[in-house]
């Protein structure tokens, strides 16, 4: 028997079956960076319309975690897909480099500033530490396959950026949004500093819940409000609080104007309580007998006076909408120095903003004899005992509730009134303008809009000052006596900014005021405060995007971060941009959820369910991590586990195998010489290119809408179903056995070439390493990198008015599926081995029969059988099987007649008819020795 193997067009490619990504990807990265891939892309895209995704800076502290990977990969997918869509999309990664976490790390290394080291030495150490952290994180981000200007990232501690942050504040001051005031701010006694809202986390804490009597100063007047002339014993208004330590700062009792309050007689005294809460108060106080003497509204009690239980002064009853009936007594203890609601209502009534607590959380001297010097949380018990001694304590119990804590120390924080600098939400209409700007932004998902609107509508003024060492100085001078800003503040801040641009923030602390103030130096002092780090990152639309030439003066199109950034970076950026420029800093804001494990639990070292991106890349490769990110609906929680990553690896293999099949069968194909014109191609080949065209339209739309999981789904459907289970299956015979340079094979290769050109581009934003690898194995002249390309424009399909249009092939796929069911059963019954052992008869109703017959002798190639014929549905015998899906179709089969051709494996009756090729069928003889078979349809 002759060996005809060398007459076959067997698939051949240098593209390996196994990705071996963990090993190969680092070499690819090396090539990308040695050849300056990012620079090549920028040069190729120069002059195109821009799309700017502005990188929200991660904090320069610690290793990257899986959440960082999700964020950076999503950004990279968008930047690369925008490049494919014809945009110039520069990406400059950034880092947030100032602030408390770095200070704490450096304190552990060298001690606190002013103790073992000077403040200047401390700042130098902070800068060095942050730079080291940036380098560590940068390596990991690059390993993810994220392309960007990694050699020139932006750091908030770059001298120029520090200077531009000062300039941003200057513009906000110039626009009239800054004011100074003593306001209650989140205060961490461990940090010794105020905290931004985004630095506050909530944990369960057990507190003492107390009901306290405030005795009426004028019993008769109070009783009269309830329509009562005589009462038995004193009258007291009962307040409820879970922070006994704040009672020394009490300056009023808040009631709700609309609520009904009752005067309740209990043994020897009368209590004032909200009518709806009388029963619950009595129950917890253990009072079983009481009588309601009279009722009135909260507004009736406004400005009546009640005696503080131990401070020796009396306080007014005032009215506030923040008073609810959710818990307590309907009367709220009000300390303007210790709470934002209390502060706001206190401003309305002109109350003193008392702050008897120092930065360390201890009472100041002169507060109260038994409290002076005590730490506030230790003072709770002392205050409760004091109330008990004074006969003011109605009830005390333990309460587990959610309490604000420092994100860094995890310890409870307090509200504390301190002199601070604020960006006002209302004095120049910032709140109103911001709410208007939000409406002009596209929020993805759209619930983000309502979320940030609620936050902006309800947020207090933004306290931007911090009492820290490592941060951008506010660069302000205030009058020693009046504490007013210097009248030339804008000009002076520019002077400071110029120095900072040269020498960094240390220039401010080294500055002798006389150098820029001249004679005014005698009357003015430097403000020692630094800026909230959220001001640093929130001003990058100005300090970085406006300042760097790569962005060409364009403002950012998109911000993309985790959903916690509505109150973080999205908020601070919106406030600063609106205060500076009167408009939002972004056109689109996209948020993603947090990573959780396979069971939906938060990632936690204590549970042991964390997955390190470094481990995944070292084991499975960056493209698997990227495919996992793209496969997930990122708008909700993003689940990751070894099992989920394994599924991504399986999906990757299917896509890779499809790409390998395409490349292997393009062996010997030169697109410049061998392409077949569309009108001369075999119909099924045009259909396959048309399926790629349809897939590309959906994939482009999904990329445009940032629905990357839909990109992956469509890609998988195309590779596994349309190509893998049909087209790539049925073309093997033609591809391998047809004449090597004949039109039947070249038509097929033309289709495979167009499909591969499209597929590699669909993959590039997500599976970047593999796309680059495929690109380097594709035939024909091409640019060095797929990343400089645009979506493939060489696709075409079948016309709708052709008889063998997409509808025809969709029906044929169903028919083939029904035939396969019959043959599968026969195979499991051991009646046939492979499908080529079968000769199939399709009994079809006239219209279907006509469509099937239009394929002529090529129907068998679609069905992968040695023979196939069509007969009338009415002629079907009892042995014919009725199709489940197609009413007018029955199927039967017999063993194929004739002999098996050793070259094509088809059974035919013309094997051996040509003496020179005595073992071959007629078709193979034509392909080996003649002009090659002709195929029209399949």
Swiss-Prot record:
Keyword Metal-binding (UniProt): yes
Cited InterPro entries: aa-tRNA-synth_I_CS, aa-tRNA-synth_Ia, Anticodon_Ile_BEm, Ile-tRNA-ligase, Ile-tRNA-ligase_type1, Ile-tRNA_ligase, M/V/L/I-tRNA-synth_anticd-bd, Rossmann-like_a/b/a_fold
CDD domains: Anticodon_Ia_Ile_BEm, IleRS_core
Chief localization: cytoplasm
Annotated function: Catalyzes the attachment of isoleucine to tRNA(Ile). As IleRS can inadvertently accommodate and process structurally similar amino acids such as valine, to avoid such errors it has two additional distinct tRNA(Ile)-dependent editing activities. One activity is designated as 'pretransfer' editing and involves the hydrolysis of activated Val-AMP. The other activity is designated 'posttransfer' editing and involves deacylation of mischarged Val-tRNA(Ile).
Complex formation: Monomer.
Protein name: Isoleucine--tRNA ligase
Organism, as annotated: Yersinia pseudotuberculosis serotype O:1b (strain IP 31758)
